[in-house]
């Protein structure tokens, strides 16, 4: 037992061994709120109330070994939701919320939307909640990721339809002729050579299958989805991707080569080009 504030400060000290101060404080807060089952107001208003976290030492060891805080607490914030996450599924990122906002702003009421490489289901579930009367499907190759996505769907958007499928092959037959107004994807896109630039909390814990692609063809997922997307998008349907900032020119050229038009690139909140949208052309079908 120790005062809430003392536990919080101990967690900050431990997290600071791996992370910058601001991030360490955010991590410490996430842990004490989740594991202590208290609110932020509880921590601020009554910092001296005693609290017990039985697994405290284990949590500290996990932090020192770079285990992501989202896996430690089993949750990740996304949009207005607190999604379940575990090893085996990519942790949702704030940049992806911006992609969701873009799709939601442009989607019409009742739109049919497909999320490819859904992971935790964050994109599909958020879009179902944000686009009135929408019909949303979500696909992933990983049974483990789909199990987590279905858990999240059951809690936040029970009518999202989850399908197991491989984005690298023509997956149109699995949807039995259903046509979509929008296809959105945050596929693997980080070149393997950039692995060394990333922190251990990503490279040692999050699934490689959701992150990395071979240097020889970093657009492999984008191209495959764009090619299948031509068959599955309604006239004037749109394809949306989260992208790697170093691949923008290649992405624009690839989409235009595949027959898409009105290719638009957007920057994220950090000013980096991280999202792209293109309209399908009936001529390209």
Please identify what each model-predicted range represents:
Residues 82, 135, 159-161, 261-264:
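Conserved beta-strand segments of alpha/beta enzyme cores
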Residues 95-197, 224:
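Conserved SAM/SAH cofactor-binding pocket of Class I
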Residues 30-105:
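Conserved AdoMet
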Residues 282-285:
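Flexible, glycine-/basic-rich loop-and-beta segments that form/coincide
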Residues 31, 66, 96, 123, ...:
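Residue-level signal for inorganic ion chemistry
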Residues 215-279:
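Conserved Class I SAM-dependent methyltransferase catalytic core
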Residues 1-48:
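Non-catalytic accessory regions of SAM-dependent methyltransferases
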Residues 189-221:
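Mobile active-site "lid"/loop adjacent to the S-adenosyl-L-methionine
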């Amino acid at each position: 037992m120790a005062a809430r504030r003392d536990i919080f400060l101990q967690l900050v000290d431990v997290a600071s061994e791996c992370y910058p101060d601001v991030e360490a404080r955010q991590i410490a807060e996430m842990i004490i709120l989740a594991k202590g089952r208290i609110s932020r107001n509880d921590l601020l208003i009554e910092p001296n109330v005693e609290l017990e976290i039985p697994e405290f030492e284990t949590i500290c060891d996990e932090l020192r070994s770079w285990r992501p805080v989202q896996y430690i607490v089993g949750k990740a914030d996304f949009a207005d939701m607190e999604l379940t996450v575990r090893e085996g599924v990519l942790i949702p990122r704030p940049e992806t919320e911006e992609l969701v906002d873009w799709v939601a702003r442009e989607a019409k009421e009742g739109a049919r939307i497909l999320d490819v490489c859904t992971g935790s289901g964050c994109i599909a579930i958020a879009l179902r909640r944000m686009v009135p009367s929408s019909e949303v499907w979500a696909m992933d190759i990983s049974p483990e990721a789909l199990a987590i996505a279905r858990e999240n769907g059951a809690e936040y958007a029970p009518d999202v339809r989850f399908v197991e499928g491989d984005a690298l092959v023509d997956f149109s037959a699995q949807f039995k002729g259903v046509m979509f107004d929008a296809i959105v994807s945050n596929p693997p896109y980080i070149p393997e050579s950039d692995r060394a630039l990333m922190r251990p909390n990503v490279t040692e814990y999050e699934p490689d299958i959701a992150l990395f692609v071979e240097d020889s063809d970093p657009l492999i997922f984008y191209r495959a989805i764009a090619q299948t997307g031509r068959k599955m998008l309604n006239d004037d349907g749109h394809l949306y991707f989260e992208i790697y900032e170093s691949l923008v020119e290649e992405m624009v050229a690839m989409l235009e080569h595949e027959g898409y038009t009105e290719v638009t690139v957007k920057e994220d909140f950090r000013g980096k080009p991280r999202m792209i949208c293109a309209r399908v052309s009936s001529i390209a079908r």
